């Protein structure tokens, strides 16, 4: 069974070797047929502390690393500055 992979944005990097990633999902309400956007925060392991708030990252499911961390950062793109 393949590991799940999610795409999200880093919202916090204040913990050591950990980033908090916000993952957005969209779905259609079953009764009202309106498209709704929901988000969820995941704690992910960042071994080298290389990602910062605003960076786009991909996280992959892993074995439990701590009480809250069950995801690992696989790759990422730096925040675009204009």
Swiss-Prot record:
What Pfam family does this protein match (any one)?
Answer: Ribosomal_S17
**Sorted alphabetically, which Gene3D superfamilies does this protein's record hold?**
Nucleic acid-binding proteins
| Origin superkingdom | Bacteria
Select a single GO molecular function from the record's annotations and give it. Answer: structural constituent of ribosome
The record's annotation in SUPFAM superfamilies points to: Nucleic acid-binding proteins
Q: Which UniProt keywords apply?
A: Ribonucleoprotein, Ribosomal protein, RNA-binding, rRNA-binding
Gene Ontology biological process: translation
Gene Ontology CC entries for this record: cytosolic small ribosomal subunit
Family the entry assigns = Belongs to the universal ribosomal protein uS17 family.
The free-text function statement in the UniProt record for this protein reads: One of the primary rRNA binding proteins, it binds specifically to the 5'-end of 16S ribosomal RNA.
> What is annotated about its quaternary structure and interactions?
Part of the 30S ribosomal subunit.
Put simply, this protein is called Small ribosomal subunit protein uS17
Q: Which organism is it from?
A: Rhodopseudomonas palustris (strain HaA2)
Q: What are the leading ranks of the lineage? A: Bacteria, Pseudomonadati, Pseudomonadota, Alphaproteobacteria, Hyphomicrobiales
């Amino acid at each position: 069974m393949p590991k799940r992979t999610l795409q999200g944005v880093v919202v916090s990097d204040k913990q050591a070797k950990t980033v908090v990633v916000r993952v957005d999902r969209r779905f259609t309400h079953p009764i009202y047929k309106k498209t709704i956007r929901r988000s969820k925060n995941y704690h992910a392991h960042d071994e080298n502390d290389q990602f910062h708030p605003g960076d786009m990252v991909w996280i992959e499911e892993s074995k439990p690393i701590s009480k809250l961390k069950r995801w690992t950062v696989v790759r990422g793109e730096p925040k675009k500055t204009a």
